[in-house]
Structures are given as C-alpha cells and as structure tokens.
Amino acid sequence: MKLLEEFIQEKGTVLPGNVLKVDAFLNHQIDPVLMQAMGNEFAKRFQDLGITKIVTIESSGIAPAVFAGLALSVPVVFARKKKSVTLTDNLFTSTVYSYTKKESNDISVSKQFLTVDDTILVIDDFLANGQAALGLLEIAEHAGAKVAGIGIVIEKSFQQGRELLNKTGIPVYSLARIASLENEEILFLEEE
C-alpha cells in the first residue's frame, strides 16, 4: 500500500536491533485518514470470506482493526494483555512473546465474544516473528472459531513470521512488506 509506505518512509525511524518506530502515526499518535485507508484496504482484500469478527491484540492493533471492522460492518474484539477486574474468568488465553519489548505476555479474550459460529479476520500492527498472530490463532482455535485471514499492517519480511504463518494455510496479507532495515534504510518488497 503506497500511502502506508510513504508514511513509513517519511515518519518512521529505524532503531538498533531491526526495530521500526512508527509512533508518529500508528503506535502512539494515530493518523485517522491513514487508518481509514488501511481499513478499507483490508476490507477489500477480505470482503468475500464471510468475516463475522475481527480479532487483534491491544493496543496498537486496535485502530487498524476498528477501521477494518467499520469497512466490513463487523465487531472488533481485542485480546487484553493485562487482566482487569471485569475480565477474570471464562477466558480464552495464550502466551505470546513480544519482539519489541523482549517479554512474554498472557493475552486473553472473553469466551462471551468468540464462538464456534465466528469466522475471524486477525489483524495485527506488526509481523516480525509471528508470535502475536500465532497467539491469536490459538485463541481462535480454543473458541472453535474459523480464521479466514490474517491482515498485517507492517511486515518485516526478513524475519521468520511470514514463514510461520504460511505454514498454517491461512491467507496472510500485509499492507507494507519491509525487505530490510539495514544501515537505517527502509527497503520495501513489492506489493502482493
């Protein structure tokens, strides 16, 4: 998606350890015009798959997921990383490792919001090692829900995440695919 690539080039920053900082439009400050365009792009890609719910992880996946949900007219469910007083039992859970934060988190979704009747689109902000998406797939499996597709905002194609997700047989679509972050230069793969 050319618009997203332009945002990444103009406002993204490469940090040591192959980390791409995109807090100017996605991870801290959110650009709603970009989010709407991304939501529409995800909807266009997945509109014929009978999606009934979108599932993501808090917090940076929420904005693109909500705009995709708006475009598809379906609810959005986000997995929580921290338990709250209102989210204590009757949960589907999985443990995921964060590449950026270098820590594991238990993620949870209330059993009330995912069922065997759901056809899910998973949306996540980044695909690096694939752990967040795999955790969401595990939660969907616990619920007995069908995962029809995985939408990624920014994929680091030089890491193993895409390969792991491809092994699931579930279609994966990334809006921006990064080939390299070497020498603080952002190089993209061609669009899918």
UniProtKB/Swiss-Prot annotation:
GO BP term (any one): purine ribonucleoside salvage
SUPFAM superfamilies named among the record's database cross-references: PRTase-like
Keyword Transferase included in the entry's annotation: yes
Identification of the protein by name: Xanthine phosphoribosyltransferase
Pathway annotation from the record: Purine metabolism; XMP biosynthesis via salvage pathway; XMP from xanthine: step 1/1
Main function: Converts the preformed base xanthine, a product of nucleic acid breakdown, to xanthosine 5'-monophosphate (XMP), so it can be reused for RNA or DNA synthesis.
Subunit structure: Homodimer.
Record-annotated membrane-spanning stretches: none
Localization per Swiss-Prot or TrEMBL: Cytoplasm
Matching PANTHER family: HYPOXANTHINE/GUANINE PHOSPHORIBOSYLTRANSFERASE, XANTHINE PHOSPHORIBOSYLTRANSFERASE
Main subcellular localisation: cytoplasm
Binding site for xanthine: 20, 27, 156
Pfam families, alphabetized: Pribosyltran
Species in which this protein is naturally found: Listeria monocytogenes serotype 4b (strain CLIP80459)
